[in-house]
Amino acid sequence: MTINNILWFRHGLRLHDNPSLLEALKSDCVNQSSEAVKLFPIFIFDGESAGTRIVGYNRMKFLLESLADLDRQFRDLGGQLLVFRGDSVTVLRRLFEELNIKKLCYEQDCEPIWKERDDAVAKLCRTMDVRCVENVSHTLWNPIEVIQTNGDIPPLTYQMFLHTVNIIGDPPRPVGAPNFEYVEFGRVPALLASELKLCQQMPAPDDFGIHYDGNARIAFQKWIGGETRALEALGARLKQEEEAFREGYYLPTQAKPEILGPATSMSAALRFGCLSVRMFYWCVHDLFAKVQSNSQFKYPGGHHITGQLIWREYFYTMSVQNPHYGEMERNPICLNIPWYKPEDDSLTRWKEGRTGFPMIDAAMRQLLAEGWLHHILRNITATFLTRGGLWLSWEEGLQHFLKYLLDADWSVCAGNWMWVSSSAFERLLDSSKCTCPIALARRLDPKGDYVKRYLPELANYPAQFVHEPWKASREQQIEYGCVIGEKYPAPMVDLAIVSKRNAHTMASLREKLVDGGSTPPHCRPSDIEEIRQFFWLADDAATEA
């Protein structure tokens, strides 16, 4: 007898450390040796799953490459990834009806934006007597368990979050590799395949009406999706981590940011689950223990050596019971700041990289061309849009980043935007640590190599002027081949003026909130060191306008 099971991929686009896959390979019978399993691995393009509601060309391409990599692996095993287009509940109902499915397995999507879909699927399974198995593997800990352990309320500070997960204990280690020896792969009958729009080959972004809109800019860094590439990249990243540990520091991509690349970030692979976050976490921690065991200098370990992963967990936990987490007015943890309405072309100029500030513009053009930005550059551009410059809502920036970033993740992306704009996770309406794009540009890119890569119109400007080209005389601008205001825009705001104005506005709002007693349950950093690490503030010069 053969048992038909479905493995439904949403995130978690991998075979390694995939407890849902292991569950789908089980027949659930007492005598499993007499029961063969027929596996149907599927993905459904429903316009929502894997963040496809708001998606640009680069991220859709990365997703499709990740699915193609999965498909290649399944084909090597004698099967294939079945990719459908349609409503998830409708597709699953028809598969249940026609294929005699006994079990549906999938990885938990913990964010509230997926709750309606998953509740409907769970109800369908109950109605049709299909066993539904959901596993936690996209996060290190189950966010619901974290909240329950904290007294059924989300931890309002990062330190409170650390305290809570320390009570729970270390995250689980990765599960073992799947055994496909006795597994048969299922096929979908032709009529049903046609009805459910089963893709005969892996689609391209253009098949979804998503076309490249990088304005013919050159993508200098190529990102390729898929588990195979992610595991290769992990090896390179671990070498970087080991070097840092041997030199006595950690978080190398944050401690010594390299904005010119090649980038060693794993964020896109983690976002789509091409790489297991548990594997990454434990590889780094085991490596740290190994280095320390052979070193005469002992450094404290703990969660901070994978701090960026822990912040990811924190943002997931803060969002899991908050369906309005990605907006301002209905969000209970977000301060309602009276941002300007984008009535002129300010927002468009920021999006297109035409602000007149070279570091901002280079970063925004890199985002359009490649779909990725270093964490530091995200902070600079986000601060400029909100409290550090244009005074426009973080919600506008969030929607732009969600569309174009390869690693755009609703919980993490929204959390970062709220922090940078001082709307949440920051000290109450504090603009004292407000990154200046010019001062930080000089520190990050002293020769202007990054700016010149993405702003070729400034290629002939010397380091003296490349971050402030308007300070060159007109004769010099002509000599450099780019007159400011003609081939490259003049600064759209006076930073000295807007920084003081914004800081004054923040201070006034803070007084009103405190005096009026209307402060919301405001998430905040535990200490100044968290702020300095997040914004990469090594000295006060980087905060001056």
From Swiss-Prot:
It is found in: Cytoplasm; Cytoplasm, Perinuclear region; Nucleus. Coiled coil: none annotated. Residues 3-140 form the Photolyase/cryptochrome alpha/beta domain. Keywords: Biological rhythms, Chromophore, Cytoplasm, FAD, Flavoprotein, Nucleotide-binding, Nucleus, Photoreceptor protein, Receptor, Repressor, Sensory transduction, Transcription, Transcription regulation. FAD binds at R237, S265, S267, Q308, H375, D407, A408, D409, C413, N416. One of its GO terms (molecular function) is FAD binding. GO terms for cellular component: cytoplasm; nucleus; perinuclear region of cytoplasm. Pfam families: DNA_photolyase, FAD_binding_7. Its cofactor is FAD. It comes from the Eukaryota. PROSITE patterns: DNA_PHOTOLYASES_1_1, PHR_CRY_ALPHA_BETA. Binds 1 FAD per subunit. InterPro entries: Crypto/Photolyase_FAD-like_sf, Crypto/Photolyase_N_sf, Cryptochr/Photolyase_FAD-bd, Cryptochrome/DNA_photolyase_1, DNA_photolyase_1_CS_C, DNA_photolyase_N, Rossmann-like_a/b/a_fold. GO terms for biological process: circadian regulation of gene expression; entrainment of circadian clock by photoperiod; negative regulation of DNA-templated transcription; nucleobase-containing compound metabolic process; regulation of circadian rhythm; response to stress. Blue light-dependent regulator that is the input of the circadian feedback loop. Has no photolyase activity for cyclobutane pyrimidine dimers or 6-4 photoproducts. Regulation of expression by light suggests a role in photoreception for locomotor activity rhythms. Functions, together with per, as a transcriptional repressor required for the oscillation of peripheral circadian clocks and for the correct specification of clock cells. Genes directly activated by the transcription factors Clock (Clk) and cycle (cyc) are repressed by cry. Interacts with tim and per; promoted by light conditions. Belongs to the DNA photolyase class-1 family. PANTHER family: CRYPTOCHROME, CRYPTOCHROME-1. FAD-binding region regulates cry stability, cry-tim interaction, and circadian photosensitivity. Photolyase/cryptochrome alpha/beta domain is sufficient for light detection and phototransduction. This is Cryptochrome-1. It comes from Anopheles gambiae (African malaria mosquito).
